[in-house]
């Protein structure tokens, strides 16, 4: 599989730097393992204030769509997703103003908010390009938004992935709990098409079939969360004390999810074929702890 990626809501290129292990200014310009075939970065302001896009282009250059046009600094809602080059991985830290600590949970509008609706641009991209893999990032509050209907917004996201034929893993990760010098809790979402070899390997590894009894299915999904899933090796966890795997079904229609669905999502979980498996986990990290003093310049 070619390592081709599309980066939405790109900022100054955080996902691109991570995928290609770009750590210093000297790393820019080196051959990248992942070929970024297209990206999008746009702020709803005057053209002269597109600082993040300007920085991205300064470091990495721009990309053209299949019509030979540069639409990387257009409102993503106005971009025809069918014109994007093909890619195998879609990444993005989609706008999260409505979920973040910048506003209280009680007043959060979630997917109904001005920027929250940009989730639908991600869904349009999934429909148009059908990438086999997706990696997204948002604030941890996403799992509980909005206050009046806890879990609705994340339920809508999962239902959209289900309808496009994806299995989804998620994990709330705090960088400080894995040795880094910043307390930063974020929800990471990894989705993969059900017809990929990766999906087949995961199911075979955890021993899952669609004919298993519920208790055996829960054991398989717990194995995926704790040992065999996408996040398990890099960000190891243990089951929290007295934690149990909870199961909940998504309504068939996305509209019904939006109107009635509620779920007490835990910090780890999997959704497969519309069934949600979620459990509370705790970090299992015993390595070096980097402090702020280790990275600050002195003198």
Per-region residue spans from a language model:
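S-adenosyl-L-methionine-dependent DNA methyltransferase catalytic core
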Residues: 1-36, 160, 186-299
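Conserved S-adenosyl-L-methionine
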Residues: 140, 166-177
